[in-house]
Amino acid sequence: MRYLTAGESHGPQLTAILEGVPAGLELRAEHINKELARRQKGYGRGRRMQIEKDEVKIVGGVRHGKTLGSPIALVVENRDFQHWQTIMAVEPIDDETEVKRKVTRPRPGHADLNGALKYGHRDMRNVLERSSARETTVRVAAGAVAKRLLEEVGIRVAGHVLEIGGVRAEKLDYRSLDELQKVTEESPVRCFDPEAGQKMMEAIDLAKKNGDSIGGIVEVIVEGVPAGVGSYVHYDRKLDAKIAAAIVSINAFKGVEFGIGFEAARRPGSEVHDEIIWSPEQGFSRRTNRAGGFEGGMTTGMPIVVRGVMKPIPTLYKPLGSVDIDTKEPFTASIERSDSCAVPAASVVAEAVVAWEVAAAIVEQFGQDRIDLIKENIERARRYAREF
């Protein structure tokens, strides 16, 4: 399974082409729209979320509510495009006013300057339109399809916010993914700990008041993946490596860890590795899950636990210093409409990219063409693991 996306932040639409999704999977627009709505929520979002109400159009690969096995084409229209039709026109324009509106002041922390250097753009709108986090809309749409596939084979994915602006959730005594999802969906910052959630909102308010932005940490948990998914044979087949790459590919994400993560550097081995246990009912398992569900690039059968670190959004309403690429004069960076904190929304994006990588690994390992055969094969693998 793989996918490609296309489209600009203020262009007419965003498009995703999904290849390798097996035939026979029940899929409707409402499955995807539910995830798109979750992405648009979250305390600290900017005014654009009041403009856009994202809805998907499935324009290929699905008929009568089921996937065909052919590429799936998804389209999400940008409702704000009506205000950008001239400046984002595909054909050449003669409007001198619009031509002169080019972006020549790169924003610190963005792709603007590096992208202009790479592609030779003198108008950095050509960079910022594509590098915008708006592109994650269709990545969430692709992830929704992956989640639908995982649901069919008994695998659950859930995400939540662990930390925003130095405020960390301490109460994480949820008893199931159902409880975690229920509580976080009701939280404006997608935090399970209500006291921490309130302090997170206060931190966001303060950052907004100061014309600043703040980042945080999100966590994604995947339950139900059988042991042995992924591979130790080659570096590029390790599933944890693929998930790590997917996490840091999200806009503004700068770090990733599994299980106890970087804490492992501060502990002795006896407090890092997970003891192996066995029971007639479950077969082999682990006493703890410090490894976060992975050993040797393969799943252990324990829940996958992965965290991603998101830096503060670099678009600031009190801009940092920059230099105009045309005049070479120092200036304060240009301002695009932005959020003061996008960590809650980013947790939904993180769910999506993790779901896609897990689903792709499941399809690769347990059969590629039909969902019914994949379900049979994965159930056979679960029985084998219990009886091993």
Swiss-Prot record:
Gene Ontology MF terms: chorismate synthase activity; FMN binding
Task: Copy the pathway line from the protein's UniProt record.
Answer: Metabolic intermediate biosynthesis; chorismate biosynthesis; chorismate from D-erythrose 4-phosphate and phosphoenolpyruvate: step 7/7
> Superkingdom of the source?
Bacteria
Q: What is its EC number?
A: 4.2.3.5
Residues the entry annotates as binding FMN: R130, S131, S132, N251, A252, G296, K311, P312, I313, P314, T315, R337
Q: Which cofactor does it need?
A: FMNH2
Top-level enzyme category: lyase
Q: Which GO terms describe its cellular component?
A: cytosol
Q: Where does NADP(+) bind?
A: R39, R45
Which reactions fall under this protein's catalytic activity? 5-O-(1-carboxyvinyl)-3-phosphoshikimate = chorismate + phosphate
**Keyword tags:** Amino-acid biosynthesis, Aromatic amino acid biosynthesis, FAD, Flavoprotein, FMN, Lyase, NADP
An example GO biological process term is: aromatic amino acid family biosynthetic process
Co-factor binding comment: Reduced FMN (FMNH(2)).
Quaternary structure annotation from Swiss-Prot or TrEMBL:
Homotetramer.
| Family listed | Belongs to the chorismate synthase family.
Give the function comment from the record. This reaction introduces a second double bond into the aromatic ring system.
What this protein is called in its record is Chorismate synthase
Organism expressing this protein natively = Geobacillus thermodenitrificans (strain NG80-2)
